[in-house]
């Protein structure tokens, strides 16, 4: 255990009276995981072809994909099953996936290579950094956030990715008419997201009753979701459209 009073040798010392630099609270925790042969193949062969790096200026995705097409960005695609299925089903659309966990990145890219898809690109870094630095304003047709970590404990709610500031950031990146699509299997988090998004300016809830939309056909059902349904667990989808 490291003595918390001893500064890290690579960290600059903070003089008395000097404010420490603000550190943004992240919504994810890095986890180590074993890599399968297929996942390693995805990283080794797929990342050089389809991986993107953080830039200091918005990326020209028309140039990246070699065309102008409807564009979707998914944050936290996990093992990539849904994103892969959606990309294969809609070759006329472009998909940008963001995921920090290497096994998931490798799994998605292995699928991209196996299926010969050309409409997928991947960032393996913090989604907030990607949105702030790489995505131009008013450029996305859809942003998807499926089953984010709900951070159940009250003291951890500040780690939830859906916050008023995040809603505003997403809105700035969507085109007018673009949709922020969220899904969760945790009822209290669904209520929380609905509360945040209902007061976020510039959005319209696409649900007729201003609550939750029926499960959209375009969102694939995962094995985890099927297992939950058998156990009686609910899933809530929210769709908010940018109106101005």
Swiss-Prot record:
Annotated positions binding substrate: 153, 185, 222-225
Similarity section: Belongs to the class I-like SAM-binding methyltransferase superfamily. TrmB family.
Enzyme class per UniProt: transferase
Residues that, per the record, bind S-adenosyl-L-methionine: 74, 99, 126, 149
InterPro entries (UniProt xref): SAM-dependent_MTases_sf, tRNA_(Gua-N-7)_MeTrfase_Trmb, tRNA_methyltr_TrmB_bact
A family per Pfam: Methyltransf_4
UniProt protein name: tRNA (guanine-N(7)-)-methyltransferase
GO cellular component term of the entry, any: tRNA methyltransferase complex
Keyword Secreted: no
UniProt catalytic activity: guanosine(46) in tRNA + S-adenosyl-L-methionine = N(7)-methylguanosine(46) in tRNA + S-adenosyl-L-homocysteine
Gene3D superfamilies recorded: Vaccinia Virus protein VP39
